[in-house]
Amino acid sequence: MATTEAGLVDGIATTRAAAAPILRAADFAPPRLLANPHLQSVLASSGLRRLLLRAARREVERASVEHILDCGGDVRLQGFLTRQHVVENARGLVVLLHGWEGSARSSYLVGTAARLLADGFDVFRLNFRDHGDTHHLNRDLFHSCRIDEVVGAVLAVRRIFASAPVAVAGFSLGGNFALRVALRAPEAVAYALAVCPVISPAAGLFGLEEGPWFYQKYFLHKWRGSLRRKRELFPDVDWFSAEDLSAGLRGLTRALVLRHTGYASLEEYLDGYSIAGRRLRDLMVPATILTAADDPVIPVDDFHALELPPQVELDIAAHGGHCGFIEDWSLRSFTGDYIAQRMQRHLAPGA
């Protein structure tokens, strides 16, 4: 395992040597007033950042084509393919995965897509089941153990659209999915990158509960809205009781598990999508995990406890919050260049 930990291991990069300088987590150094982890986390998905990214959003979405993918088992997922126009042949195709209750239109995904397109990569932004405006596509609810359909989506993207190597990159829960896709289907991807991935879901749930009130309020508000949308589309299904919907994050998650997943307990479900400890030790493809020591949602100890193969780079910044990494007051994210450089290295090293 290659590890870089800014501020915790003297800021010295111990990742494998590169042919040319490449960004490390240690290079992320926000202004003092921007270093607060909660500010970093909130700004990343803020309305202000969406406003500042409006030109990039227009450019990405103007050239995007919607596709409904057959992911096997009668599951359909929506995604948006955007072709690059800066080189004759694309340097690769990158599948981008959003976080829980995000979407293919989330600011961090659109900003990353714009950066990759500018470097000559095609981009496919996938919506998970029941994310974005896709609740009508499948009758059953989304849950985080639905890895088979995401693997199916990536395989479909590779088969139908890719004329160059394929990589997958994800944020938060999307990072967890990205690493599980690479673990399950190494033939599908040449590289995987995860930003602040959920490692131990039980610890992540506890972190949301014990953190500042606005994190849990934010996710509960979005999740309840998603469940109401599902109920409107499929009124014949007994989705949740009023008591379930008024519960906190743990209570509503437990109700989801017992009513709609087939798992016997909340604990069994959370363990079902854990990638903690030794679970990534058999990962065959090169991968990078970028996180921040001050992430208020995902405990940094989860990353220290990982057992990873040599081709997996673990890069821990001192600051960055949860999927923040906001560099300056223009709200530019460090992750754009960071991801683009690694895609260049792993998908098109000779370009």
Segments predicted by a language model, with ranges:
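N-terminal cap/lid segment of alpha/beta-hydrolase-fold proteins
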Residues: 45-86, 326-327
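Short, surface-exposed "cap/lid" segments of acyl-processing enzymes
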Residues: 76, 82-137, 156, 302
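Catalytic nucleophile-loop/oxyanion-hole region of alpha/beta-hydrolase
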Residues: 129-167
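Alpha/beta-hydrolase-fold enzymes
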Residues: 159, 163, 167-260
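Active-site nucleophile elbow and catalytic-triad environment of alpha/beta-hydrolase enzymes
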Residues: 255-279
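Short beta-strand/loop motif that positions the catalytic acidic residue
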Residues: 283, 289-291, 295
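Catalytic histidine neighborhood in serine/cysteine hydrolases
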Residues: 308-324
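Catalytic histidine-centered segment of alpha/beta-hydrolase-like enzymes
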Residues: 320-334
